[in-house]
Design a protein with these regions (language model features):
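Short hydrophobic/aromatic helix or loop-helix immediately within or flanking a transmembrane segment
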Residues: 39-40, 55-76, 89
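Signature aromatic-anchored transmembrane alpha helix within multi-pass, membrane-resident enzymes
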Residues: 6-12, 110, 114, 166, ...
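Short acidic/glycine- and proline-prone juxtamembrane loop motifs at membrane-interface regions
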Residues: 59, 124-137
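Perimembrane helix-loop-helix junctions
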Residues: 151-155, 161, 181-210, 215, ...
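Transmembrane-helix motifs of polytopic, lipid-linked glycan transferases
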Residues: 85-106, 144, 281
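Membrane-embedded, lumen/periplasm-facing catalytic core of multi-pass transferases
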Residues: 361-416
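Hydrophobic, aromatic-rich transmembrane alpha-helices
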Residues: 190, 259-303, 340-341, 358-359
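Membrane-lumen/periplasm interface segments of specific transmembrane helices
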Residues: 199-276, 299-303
């Protein structure tokens, strides 16, 4: 059996075990974003207005297109496994690619397995790959692209460049980190080949994805840059945070670096951050390691620049304001730290010394995660904070999962309806839903069978509609209440 196959099977078993644990721990749907990703994929078909336009512009489309076939299977959508299947595949891809990179760079087979163990046993990544979050997908695509580029650097075969371009195209269509990686990789290809032909072969597919995204935005939303300057864009959301004084990182490069490295420490591990950084610096002295490490480390300047430009936000437990916002972004540096730690220590110690040093570091890191569980596991800590931060919404979703039987549901904009409720997306009516939304606000009993009201939200159109309907209490009965969150059922 080939070593790549063995790695894939071992990591697959680890991923499956994590999937089981996450489902038993009820954390698969902890992130609101994970639920939204599943719903976006589902609504391309299950919607009052089905079609590709339902992909929207909030997020890039590749993850939702990958989730789409699985979300059409009701049980996989309800329990979140539709996202976990794709996430686990990306998890295996990343581990196999890391093994490929280190095996090619090192003369010791054990070094590649150690790098795999570092990434495959990281608790934040193990958790995220059970969800529909997009970070594992990006890590898988970037690692695969880096492995192909490294292989091309040695052999120079054009098909390897096309393969690297294909993986990069998937990264470009998954997260904007991929756009930065594509630019860095294109420069690397040019520096290695000193010819424009190889660069064009590499960037062809990523360029097609970018062009397709611009055309999609222009055709469906009237602006090719809707994803950047629309009301749901990251820039718009961060502008709101900045207006409230909640974006201290904008325009502060050193602070940005500190924030991002804090997120790395809380997700990838503080010891690994130290050892991986030192190892990478040592490995950079060797020419053959430079391209791989620079590609894997490209996520660092991207995230720092995103914070600097106000396009991203991170909150740490010790910052002001304190929080656990987007801690998961730190996991992007995990492959770079794993590869750097192994390659760097390999040049400092004998095989036995390297194994001993990494075993000690690994034991200390695992002990830290276990001693302060789950606070020391940044991704899980963030997910739990979101899940438990609004207990009313969580209980409302669980109540609907056992009491909802049929009919349309008018939903307040601020309320998140979980896939676990089993309410089809075509039966969810929001104030903006084409034709049905305005009609439901005007006469709820004529359009819907259920109404979800959130009296906490000022100016909520559903709350206003309920208050304005003099016959509402006669036509609907209160079936559930958790603080100001109410669910009404038609009599």
């Amino acid at each position: 059996m080939r070593s790549t196959t063995r790695v894939g099977l071992v990591v697959l078993c680890v991923g499956i075990a994590a999937q089981v644990a996450a489902h038993l721990g009820d954390v698969v749907l902890a992130f609101w974003d994970a639920q939204a990703h599943l719903d976006i994929a589902r609504r391309v078909i299950d919607s009052t207005t089905p079609g590709l336009q339902m992909l929207g512009t909030v997020w890039l489309p590749v993850p939702h297109l990958l989730y789409l076939p699985f979300t059409q299977i009701d049980p996989l959508w309800w329990n979140g496994l539709a996202g976990g299947i794709v996430g686990m595949a990306a998890f295996v891809l990343m581990a196999v690619s890391v093994h490929d990179i280190v095996r090619r760079r090192s003369e010791r087979a054990a070094a590649a397995w150690i790098a795999v163990a570092i990434v495959a046993c990281n608790p934040t990544l193990l958790y995220l790959q059970t969800t529909a979050m997009t970070e594992p997908l990006l890590l898988g695509f970037l690692a695969a692209a880096t492995a192909r580029l490294d292989h091309w650097r040695e052999g120079g075969e054009d098909r390897l460049l096309l393969g690297a371009g294909a993986w990069t195209a998937l990264a470009v269509g998954s997260r904007y980190d991929g756009w930065f990686f594509a630019a860095v990789a294109a420069v690397a290809v040019l520096a290695i080949s000193r010819r424009i032909g190889p660069v064009l072969r590499f960037v062809a597919l990523p360029a097609v994805v970018v062009a397709a995204w611009l055309v999609f935005n222009a055709v469906y939303f009237g602006d090719p840059l809707e994803f950047q300057r629309g009301i749901w864009s990251a820039a718009s959301q961060q502008a709101t945070l900045a207006g409230e004084g909640l974006l201290p990182t904008r325009g502060a490069p050193l602070l940005d670096l500190g924030y991002y490295l804090g997120a790395v420490g809380l997700t990838s591990g503080w010891l690994l951050l130290a050892v991986g950084t030192l190892g990478s610096l040592l490995a950079l002295r060797h020419r053959e390691h430079r391209v791989v490490l620079l590609l894997l480390w490209s996520v660092l300047p991207f995230n720092v620049l995103a914070l600097f430009a106000g396009q991203s936000a991170i909150a740490l437990p010790w910052t002001d304001p304190a929080g656990v916002l987007n801690l998961r972004y730190g996991i992007m540096l995990l492959p770079a730290l794993a590869v750097g730690a192994v390659l760097g220590l390999e040049h400092l110690a004998t095989r036995r010394g390297m194994l001993l040093a990494l075993a000690v570091v690994g034991a200390l890191q695992v002990g830290h995660f276990a001693w302060n569980w789950p606070a020391a596991v940044g991704g899980l800590r963030e997910g739990l904070a979101i899940r438990d931060g609004d207990a009313a919404q969580m209980r409302a979703s669980r109540w609907l999962a056992t009491h909802y039987d049929r009919g349309r549901v008018l939903v307040a904009p601020a309320v998140n309806i979980s896939p676990r409720t089993r309410i089809r997306l075509r039966d969810r009516v929001y104030p903006w839903t084409w034709e049905l939304g305005p009609a439901a606000l005007d006469a709820p009993a004529e359009v819907v069978d259920w109404v979800v009201v959130d009296r906490r939200a000022q100016g909520d159109p559903v709350t206003k509609a309920v208050a304005a309907d003099t016959s509402f209490d006669r036509r609907f009965q209160l079936a559930f209440r958790e603080r100001e969150l109410e669910i009404w059922q038609r009599r």
